[in-house]
Amino acid sequence: MDSPTLPHSISASSSTPFASAAVKPHRNKLLSRNGILIIIAASCILLLLISLLIYATVSKSSRNHHNPSHQTPTSDDHPPPETPPSPPPIAQIRLACNATRFPDHCVASLSKPGQVPPDPKPVQIIHSAISVSYENLKSGQSKIQSILDSSAGNRNRTNIATICLEILSYSQHRTESTDIAVTSGDIKDARAWMSAALAYQFDCWSGLKTVNDTKQVVDTITFFEGLVNLTGNALSMMLSFDSFGDDVVSWIRPATERDGFWEKAGPSLGSGTGTEASLGFPSGLTEDVTVCKNGGKDCKYKTVQEAVDSAPDTNRTVKFVIRIREGVYEETVRVPFEKKNVVFIGDGMGKTVITGSLNVGQPGMTTFESATVGVLGDGFMARDLTIENTAGADAHQAVAFRSDSDFSVLENCEFLGNQDTLYAHSLRQFYKQCRIQGNVDFIFGNSAAVFQDCDILIASKHSKLEQGGANNAITAHGRIDASQSTGFVFLNCSINGTEEYMKEFQANPEGHKNFLGRPWKEFSRTVFVNCNLESLISPDGWMPWNGDFALKTLYYGEYKNTGPGSVRSSRVPWSSEIPEKHVDVYSVANFIQADEWASTTA
């Protein structure tokens, strides 16, 4: 508002009745009194105008104080129009997206105005890629819910949609944690969690393909293909950022060890630092509750699940220790996502036994749900017990132990089964001095897992379908993207057969072929380092999955193994000898960062 001006009739430059010296007051007393009245009236008017001016100024200031958006009005007192979003920084986006498997898809997803800030730092581009993945994940969850809502009466589709919703909730949580970890600079954690988020999305996509009998499902499958690519793009950027830092020009597309790409390594496997020996199950733990099969005055629970249910749901860092006394516990145990740092301590292998027999031969059963013990809560640990699935080999997939627990340690534990005994599904897991027994793909999943000083035993199938011999693969790793920080590492392990199986093998060695692994997914990764491989391992060492699938993209490595099954002269050409200068990549500290979370000191 413009400032008011004084009226010309009473301005300082105007003539007044009292301005002339020729006017004499004594000539007319009435006129003098009138002049005085005029002066008084003029003064009142002047004071009134000044008051109005002050009020207007203060009022305007007050409005500006309480309404910041009006602090800089235009000349006509209207607010300025909103500034449109800056155009996307295409050059920087293109550079970052060149480090992904799907660069064009990546650029398109990040080119919406305002999606990436002007002149962005590499971390800001990564954040934007995570955000795009997250928003599409939320849309995917809505699509799955719609499938579930429309699938009443269809058992298989209902089961798949239900499992999808469950694992996508884990994907959502891991994606949220990834974004926080990138901000705080914990890039190894970020990569581990985004690797899991991607695995869950892929698993849902794979499950949907088994029930693609409606247009709604087919369209959702197509949507999830795009989501998997978006998440993989974000993960690819994280890998390059971890390897090359802010120098985006140096970023490269995800590559494998066979391409000559090796991650940076810290302490070596044989450095004498004692790092490997000092990692494992913590000492000095005191039980919070005790489980006894037949009860007792010192035992609060009779089942393991009751004890798990009693653990607090808070995001605690203190371990909740469950002591499980000797006995055979016939039950299905689930450690849910909200139960963190749960610990099982038994009375020894073969003494404390948790047993079940769920398998995919049962109507509506899936591999994921068949586990005798399934763990989702982070920080899970176990020691001195046996977990088994007694379903026979002809029942096909029948999991004894399934883990999606990050920062997980299992020491001096036994896992018994046939096909798919140990499902190391996702995240970072450490198995030390364990005994793992099975026959077909009996260590499988898409986790980053290290097996140290373990006995790996091939068991007899007792199969009516495979009389006279069969092929067995120990591992089936499921890495789906080269940017995932996952794989199986076997350090100082013994690879042999059970006593019963070795009798069968020696009676008919040509009829029994045993392999270190086969590629379940395209970028399968498994290595054996300083292991003893007995004669039951076939000279070619590794087994194809189906034709030439994944043979150009997998990484199967060996280093300084011993025993009659370790000779590499007849190995398949798509396996590798690990260069000595790079073997430290697979240490417990480097591969799963166990030096940060698996100290033997409680």
Swiss-Prot record:
Tissue: Expressed in siliques.
Keywords on record: Aspartyl esterase, Disulfide bond, Glycoprotein, Hydrolase, Membrane, Transmembrane, Transmembrane helix
Glycosylation sites: N98, N156, N212, N229, N315, N492, N496
GO biological process, any: cell wall modification
Biased composition (Pro residues): 81-90
UniProt topology in membrane: Single-pass membrane protein
Active-site annotation: D420 (proton donor), D441 (nucleophile)
Residue numbers spanned by region Pectinesterase inhibitor 64: 87-237
Key word Cell membrane present: no
Biochemical pathway: Glycan metabolism; pectin degradation; 2-dehydro-3-deoxy-D-gluconate from pectin: step 1/5
Molecular function GO terms recorded: enzyme inhibitor activity; pectinesterase activity
Family from the record: In the N-terminal section; belongs to the PMEI family.
Note: The PMEI region may act as an autoinhibitory domain and prevent untimely PME activity during transport.
UniProt-recorded name of the protein: Probable pectinesterase/pectinesterase inhibitor 64
The encoding gene: PME64
